[in-house]
Amino acid sequence: MFLFDWFYGILASLGLWQKEAKILFLGLDNAGKTTLLHMLKDERLVQHQPTQHPTSEELSIGKIKFKAFDLGGHQIARRVWKDYYAKVDAVVYLVDAYDKERFSESKKELDALLSDDALATVPFLILGNKIDNPYAASEDELRYHLGLTNFTTGKGKVTTAGGDSGVRPLEVFMCSIVRKMGYGEGFKWLSQYIN
Protein backbone atom coordinates (compact mmCIF):
# COMPACT_ATOMS: atom_id res chain seq x y z
CA MET A 1 0.00 0.00 0.00
CA PHE A 2 2.87 2.36 0.81
CA LEU A 3 4.26 1.89 -2.71
CA PHE A 4 0.88 2.72 -4.26
CA ASP A 5 0.57 5.88 -2.16
CA TRP A 6 4.11 6.89 -3.03
CA PHE A 7 3.56 6.43 -6.79
CA TYR A 8 0.20 8.20 -6.59
CA GLY A 9 1.85 11.11 -4.82
CA ILE A 10 4.60 11.39 -7.42
CA LEU A 11 2.27 11.22 -10.40
CA ALA A 12 -0.41 13.41 -8.83
CA SER A 13 2.23 16.03 -8.05
CA LEU A 14 3.28 15.94 -11.69
CA GLY A 15 -0.33 16.26 -12.84
CA LEU A 16 -0.45 12.81 -14.41
CA TRP A 17 -3.06 11.18 -12.15
CA GLN A 18 -5.80 9.39 -14.13
CA LYS A 19 -4.21 10.24 -17.44
CA GLU A 20 -2.66 8.09 -20.11
CA ALA A 21 0.29 9.46 -21.98
CA LYS A 22 3.04 8.50 -24.37
CA ILE A 23 5.92 10.88 -23.77
CA LEU A 24 9.21 11.04 -25.64
CA PHE A 25 12.32 12.07 -23.72
CA LEU A 26 14.65 13.63 -26.28
CA GLY A 27 17.80 15.73 -26.28
CA LEU A 28 21.50 15.45 -26.96
CA ASP A 29 23.61 12.88 -25.18
CA ASN A 30 24.50 13.75 -21.57
CA ALA A 31 21.53 16.11 -21.16
CA GLY A 32 19.96 14.01 -18.39
CA LYS A 33 17.15 12.06 -20.09
CA THR A 34 17.86 8.70 -18.46
CA THR A 35 18.56 10.30 -15.09
CA LEU A 36 15.21 12.11 -15.24
CA LEU A 37 13.37 8.95 -16.19
CA HIS A 38 14.87 7.07 -13.24
CA MET A 39 14.09 9.93 -10.86
CA LEU A 40 10.47 9.87 -12.01
CA LYS A 41 10.32 6.09 -11.75
CA ASP A 42 11.89 5.46 -8.37
CA GLU A 43 13.53 8.70 -7.17
CA ARG A 44 16.93 7.09 -7.55
CA LEU A 45 20.04 8.90 -8.64
CA VAL A 46 22.53 6.53 -10.24
CA GLN A 47 25.35 6.90 -12.73
CA HIS A 48 24.28 5.89 -16.22
CA GLN A 49 26.16 4.82 -19.29
CA PRO A 50 25.10 6.67 -22.45
CA THR A 51 21.84 5.22 -23.77
CA GLN A 52 22.76 3.07 -26.76
CA HIS A 53 19.31 1.72 -27.59
CA PRO A 54 15.81 3.14 -27.09
CA THR A 55 14.29 2.13 -23.77
CA SER A 56 10.83 2.59 -22.35
CA GLU A 57 9.41 2.61 -18.88
CA GLU A 58 5.76 1.98 -18.20
CA LEU A 59 4.16 2.70 -14.87
CA SER A 60 0.64 1.47 -14.35
CA ILE A 61 -1.11 1.84 -11.03
CA GLY A 62 -4.87 2.03 -10.83
CA LYS A 63 -5.95 4.38 -13.60
CA ILE A 64 -2.48 5.80 -14.18
CA LYS A 65 -0.70 4.83 -17.36
CA PHE A 66 2.52 6.62 -18.09
CA LYS A 67 4.79 5.35 -20.85
CA ALA A 68 8.04 7.18 -21.37
CA PHE A 69 10.51 6.51 -24.16
CA ASP A 70 14.14 7.37 -23.53
CA LEU A 71 15.75 7.63 -26.94
CA GLY A 72 19.51 8.01 -26.90
CA GLY A 73 20.93 11.43 -27.70
CA HIS A 74 24.14 10.58 -29.51
CA GLN A 75 24.21 11.29 -33.24
CA ILE A 76 23.45 7.74 -34.43
CA ALA A 77 20.58 7.29 -31.95
CA ARG A 78 18.94 10.53 -33.14
CA ARG A 79 18.27 8.86 -36.50
CA VAL A 80 15.57 6.66 -34.91
CA TRP A 81 13.72 9.44 -33.09
CA LYS A 82 11.29 9.76 -35.99
CA ASP A 83 10.24 6.12 -35.57
CA TYR A 84 8.62 7.03 -32.23
CA TYR A 85 6.55 10.07 -33.25
CA ALA A 86 3.32 8.15 -33.94
CA LYS A 87 0.59 8.86 -31.40
CA VAL A 88 2.92 10.70 -29.06
CA ASP A 89 1.17 12.94 -26.51
CA ALA A 90 4.12 15.11 -25.51
CA VAL A 91 7.84 15.67 -25.98
CA VAL A 92 10.20 16.46 -23.13
CA TYR A 93 13.35 17.93 -24.67
CA LEU A 94 16.32 18.19 -22.32
CA VAL A 95 19.23 20.56 -22.78
CA ASP A 96 22.42 20.58 -20.72
CA ALA A 97 22.36 24.24 -19.62
CA TYR A 98 26.01 24.00 -18.59
CA ASP A 99 27.32 22.71 -21.95
CA LYS A 100 27.07 26.01 -23.83
CA GLU A 101 29.32 24.78 -26.64
CA ARG A 102 26.55 22.39 -27.73
CA PHE A 103 23.67 24.89 -27.71
CA SER A 104 23.80 25.29 -31.51
CA GLU A 105 23.68 21.51 -31.98
CA SER A 106 20.79 21.27 -29.53
CA LYS A 107 18.98 24.11 -31.35
CA LYS A 108 19.41 22.33 -34.68
CA GLU A 109 17.82 19.14 -33.31
CA LEU A 110 15.03 21.06 -31.57
CA ASP A 111 14.29 23.02 -34.75
CA ALA A 112 14.01 19.75 -36.69
CA LEU A 113 11.55 18.39 -34.12
CA LEU A 114 9.46 21.56 -34.05
CA SER A 115 9.22 21.68 -37.84
CA ASP A 116 8.24 18.01 -38.26
CA ASP A 117 4.59 17.71 -39.36
CA ALA A 118 4.13 14.55 -37.28
CA LEU A 119 4.71 16.65 -34.14
CA ALA A 120 2.90 19.81 -35.27
CA THR A 121 0.32 19.77 -32.47
CA VAL A 122 2.36 17.97 -29.80
CA PRO A 123 3.17 20.00 -26.67
CA PHE A 124 6.88 20.49 -25.94
CA LEU A 125 8.38 20.83 -22.49
CA ILE A 126 11.96 22.04 -22.77
CA LEU A 127 14.01 21.43 -19.64
CA GLY A 128 17.26 23.33 -19.18
CA ASN A 129 19.03 20.88 -16.89
CA LYS A 130 22.07 21.15 -14.59
CA ILE A 131 21.29 24.55 -13.09
CA ASP A 132 22.99 23.31 -9.93
CA ASN A 133 26.22 24.23 -11.75
CA PRO A 134 26.95 27.93 -11.09
CA TYR A 135 28.11 28.39 -14.69
CA ALA A 136 24.93 27.02 -16.27
CA ALA A 137 23.00 29.28 -18.62
CA SER A 138 20.10 31.30 -17.29
CA GLU A 139 16.60 30.70 -18.63
CA ASP A 140 16.78 33.84 -20.79
CA GLU A 141 20.19 32.84 -22.15
CA LEU A 142 18.93 29.34 -22.99
CA ARG A 143 15.81 30.73 -24.70
CA TYR A 144 18.02 33.02 -26.77
CA HIS A 145 20.42 30.28 -27.89
CA LEU A 146 17.57 27.90 -28.75
CA GLY A 147 15.79 30.62 -30.74
CA LEU A 148 12.80 30.58 -28.39
CA THR A 149 12.77 34.20 -27.20
CA ASN A 150 9.18 35.44 -27.66
CA PHE A 151 8.26 32.06 -29.13
CA THR A 152 7.13 30.09 -26.08
CA THR A 153 3.49 30.06 -25.07
CA GLY A 154 3.80 30.99 -21.40
CA LYS A 155 3.84 29.11 -18.15
CA GLY A 156 0.10 29.51 -17.59
CA LYS A 157 -2.65 27.56 -19.34
CA VAL A 158 -2.69 28.03 -23.10
CA THR A 159 -6.11 27.75 -24.69
CA THR A 160 -5.73 25.44 -27.66
CA ALA A 161 -9.46 25.20 -28.52
CA GLY A 162 -9.35 21.47 -29.07
CA GLY A 163 -6.11 21.71 -30.99
CA ASP A 164 -7.63 23.95 -33.69
CA SER A 165 -6.01 27.22 -32.65
CA GLY A 166 -2.71 26.42 -34.33
CA VAL A 167 -0.90 27.16 -31.07
CA ARG A 168 1.43 24.41 -29.93
CA PRO A 169 2.09 24.55 -26.18
CA LEU A 170 5.83 25.06 -25.78
CA GLU A 171 7.66 26.26 -22.71
CA VAL A 172 11.11 26.30 -21.10
CA PHE A 173 11.66 25.35 -17.47
CA MET A 174 15.04 25.29 -15.80
CA CYS A 175 15.85 22.32 -13.57
CA SER A 176 18.40 20.30 -11.70
CA ILE A 177 17.51 16.64 -11.82
CA VAL A 178 20.17 15.70 -9.28
CA ARG A 179 18.80 18.29 -6.82
CA LYS A 180 15.17 17.39 -7.68
CA MET A 181 14.37 21.00 -8.66
CA GLY A 182 12.29 22.52 -11.44
CA TYR A 183 11.17 19.55 -13.48
CA GLY A 184 8.08 19.01 -11.32
CA GLU A 185 6.77 22.44 -12.29
CA GLY A 186 7.48 21.62 -15.91
CA PHE A 187 5.50 18.39 -15.77
CA LYS A 188 2.60 20.14 -14.04
CA TRP A 189 2.53 22.62 -16.91
CA LEU A 190 2.75 19.81 -19.48
CA SER A 191 -0.02 17.77 -17.87
CA GLN A 192 -2.56 20.47 -18.80
CA TYR A 193 -2.18 19.43 -22.44
CA ILE A 194 -2.37 15.66 -22.06
CA ASN A 195 -5.94 14.47 -22.50
Curated annotation (Swiss-Prot):
Location of the motif STAR: 2-4
Annotated binding of Mg(2+), by residue: D29, D70
Gene Ontology terms for molecular function: GTP binding; GTPase activity; metal ion binding
Regulation: Small GTPases activation is mediated by guanine exchange factors (GEF), while inactivation through hydrolysis of the bound GTP is stimulated by GTPase activating proteins (GAP).
Binding site for GTP: N30, G32, K33, T34, T35, N129, K130, D132, I177
Catalytic reaction annotation: GTP + H2O = GDP + phosphate + H(+)
GO cellular component, one term: endoplasmic reticulum membrane
Binding site for GDP: N30, A31, G32, K33, T34, T35, H53, N129, K130, D132, I177
Membrane topology: Peripheral membrane protein
EC id: 3.6.5.2
SUPFAM superfamilies: P-loop containing nucleoside triphosphate hydrolases
Enzyme class: hydrolase
Tissue-wise expression: Expressed in most tissues.
Gene Ontology process terms (BP): endoplasmic reticulum to Golgi vesicle-mediated transport; intracellular protein transport; membrane organization; regulation of COPII vesicle coating; vesicle organization
InterPro entries according to UniProt: P-loop_NTPase (IPR027417), Small_GTP-bd (IPR005225), Small_GTPase_ARF/SAR (IPR006689), Small_GTPase_SAR1 (IPR006687)
Keyword field: Endoplasmic reticulum, ER-Golgi transport, Golgi apparatus, GTP-binding, Hydrolase, Magnesium, Membrane, Metal-binding, Nucleotide-binding, Protein transport, Transport
Cellular localization per UniProt: Endoplasmic reticulum membrane; Golgi apparatus, Golgi stack membrane
Stretch list, region Mediates recruitment to ER membranes: 10-14
Matching Pfam families: Arf
Annotated function: Small GTPase that cycles between an active GTP-bound and an inactive GDP-bound state and mainly functions in vesicle-mediated endoplasmic reticulum (ER) to Golgi transport. The active GTP-bound form inserts into the endoplasmic reticulum membrane where it recruits the remainder of the coat protein complex II/COPII. The coat protein complex II assembling and polymerizing on endoplasmic reticulum membrane is responsible for both the sorting of cargos and the deformation and budding of membranes into vesicles destined to the Golgi.
Subunit organization: Homodimer; upon association with membrane. Part of the coat protein complex II/COPII, composed of SEC23/24 and SEC13/31 heterodimers, that it helps recruit and assemble on endoplasmic reticulum (ER) membranes at ER exit site.
Membership in a protein family: Belongs to the small GTPase superfamily. SAR1 family.
UniProt name for this protein: Small COPII coat GTPase SAR1B
Source species taxonomy: Eukaryota, Viridiplantae, Streptophyta, Embryophyta, Tracheophyta
Gene this protein is translated from: SAR1B
